[in-house]
Structure formats: C-alpha cells, structure tokens
C-alpha cells in the first residue's frame, strides 16, 4: 500500500482547528468526569442525611432504638412491647398525631412501653427538646411534653427564639429554674439530642413523626390499623 507523503503545512497566524474526533473525545471526557463528580456528591449526601446508613445490624438497631437515658412516657412491666416515636415538638404532623398517641397510651397502659426520641427539624425544636430534657431532670418530662404540644400553635413556626416561652412553661410547672437553666444549657443535653438524631438517621428516619413497634418501622394509614399491630405484638 502506498502512503501519501506528508505535506508541509502552510504557515498561518490562525491556530489549527481540532479534528471532530478529538472534539468529541474531549467532550466525552468532560461529561464522564462530570457524572463521576455528581455521583460522588449524591453518595456523600446520602450518607450525610442518613440514607446510606439505614440498615444497621440487628444488635445495633436495638441499641439505637432505645437508649438507657431515653425518655419513657410509660413502662410495661413485662417489657414485651415497645413503641418508639421519633418526634419534633414543633412539627405540625407530630401535633396532629399527639391525641392519637395519647389514646394509644390510655388503651395500653401497663402493657406497652412508650418511648420518645428527639428528631428536631424546625427553628425552635432544638430549644423545645432541650426544655423537655431539662424538665425530665426534675421528673417533669411528661408535663413538659404535654405543654409543648398543647401550646404548639402559639409558639411554633416562629423565626424568633421561643426560649422565653419554654422557660415560662418551666416556671408554670414549678421547676427549680436555676437547675432547669443548668441542664438546658449543658452541652451534654445538646449531645443527647444530637445522638437521638444520629440514631434516627441510622434507623432510616427522614421525617417526623416516625414510629417503631418492637423494632419495626410502622407504616399505617389509620389509627385502627395501628391498634391491630399493637394487639398482634401483644398476642405474639
């Protein structure tokens, strides 16, 4: 086969144009690199938000669901059935679920353990959770729990801090205010709330309220369906 002799290119002040194949190659490399970067960002986001850690081993799941210092609204002596709620005191959906949870507690008093975990998502929900934990240190968690939900329409969805409101609740409950302030401001209280959030994310919690019954996430469409699940757990 005869090869054509290379030609000496003519002198020109203009840069030589890239061939179409080289242009396509360069474009494809850029697109591929872009997709790699996007995929990395998405994966990092999943782990940061907790989506990548939803499947914790069974033993770890049990520890994450209920910690020794988790707040218990009521405790069943046999410990057979445990109902856990990850909540946000400022969450409107949590407020809407509150009467149903109270009815559930009434129906299963002494037979089901009810546990509350913090999962704050709103402007003042960390402060509200801190107030509840500070009240718990004086044996008044349930009282503050009720007060926060029953008055949520008054302080919720506010841009400004509602700390004074929460301290007012503490005074109304007759708490030692110096002791309340100490626990409220304690870094250990903030760490407890952050750990609740981390546990929730590891368990697949992405919003509130999220319920677990004996370790299984509850997904029901109505109150009767929830009652049926609790009855089945008690009968098992």
Give names to the regions the model predicted.
Residues 62, 92, 189:
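Short, flexible loop segments at the rims of nucleotide/cofactor-binding pockets, characterized by
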Residues 79, 84-90, 95-171, 206, ...:
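Structural alpha/beta surface segment adjacent to cysteine/selenocysteine redox centers
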Residues 67-72, 100-102, 196-199:
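A generic local structural motif
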Residues 2-46, 171-236:
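C-terminal cap of thioredoxin/glutaredoxin-like
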Residues 64-66, 96, 192:
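Short secondary-structure boundary/capping elements
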Residues 11, 17-19, 58-69:
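Glycine-rich, low-complexity intrinsically disordered regions
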Residues 43-62:
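C-terminal region of N-terminal signal peptides and the immediate post-cleavage residues
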Residues 63-81, 106:
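A short beta-strand-turn-helix
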